[in-house]
């Protein structure tokens, strides 16, 4: 459960404001837009807002060089309704998405290797009669991409990315499925690949191992990295003569606390040598965790690394001068899956 819906918005703006008279005489190109939304991170999780334990140099640089919105609030304290307020522009009291209602309850199960998963997954759909952000921007000439968590409709509903103005999608249709960082499948919609609807892309290496227990960590296809790489590949295909908008809705640092055992994690394991463990909660798809503090801190530093890679890609492509980058969280900090906000002094 999230303690607060207060969030942090940072913008890195690569286009200068021009005098009105000059704008009237000169055709100013539409700015590209990247909207980076992480999951269950409070403003107190960032070094630029006083976090003493977690290293976030790239986001800190955004804060120094861009603009901070210190009185910004998320639309809701949980995933689906918070995203609904963003996508619809409605107050949460006006949109009918009021919670993380799951549409997989009672549906048949399908087999993925030795694992069973739901035949249909997702949340309450957005009203198809109400225009949402990707549709609005597409109507204004933008190429649109969404990478990460959707939570705006269930598979086969009237509100999946392919029906809502999105040219390319890769990630989780369902917020509950995103509780597994090593999932059985991810969802995809790509016109370039010939998709006519959202499909499932099976994680063939993952399904060779169980979803729960010690052997779960033998799974190697880490969704956060896979989704981020898909976003970078999409960004690499963009050109300066066609405006684009990308919604990169990262699942980090939402529970479960799981990630590759690499140098990012090892550094925090050394830092928090005396650490906590957590026993897991299978009903919510949270596996048991050791080194909970190190895991959580490493997830945020990993996210920060991804942000740095995005800025590097923009510069490499020569797109950094005409791209607005916005960074925020869907809501405040969480206590799920072994996370310990009190240890980090988080808000």
Name each model feature, range by range.
Residues 1-29:
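Bacterial Sec-dependent N-terminal signal peptides
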Residues 24, 43-132, 136, 142-145, ...:
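Active-site segment of extracytoplasmic enzymes that catalyze sulfate/phosphate-ester chemistry
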Residues 28-31, 38-53, 70, 100-102, ...:
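Active-site-proximal cap/lid insertion segments
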Residues 32, 58, 132, 161, ...:
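Amphipathic alpha-helical recognition patches that constitute DNA-binding helices
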Residues 32-34, 85:
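Residues embedded in well-ordered beta-strands
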Residues 34, 143-145, 246:
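Conserved beta-strand elements of the Class I
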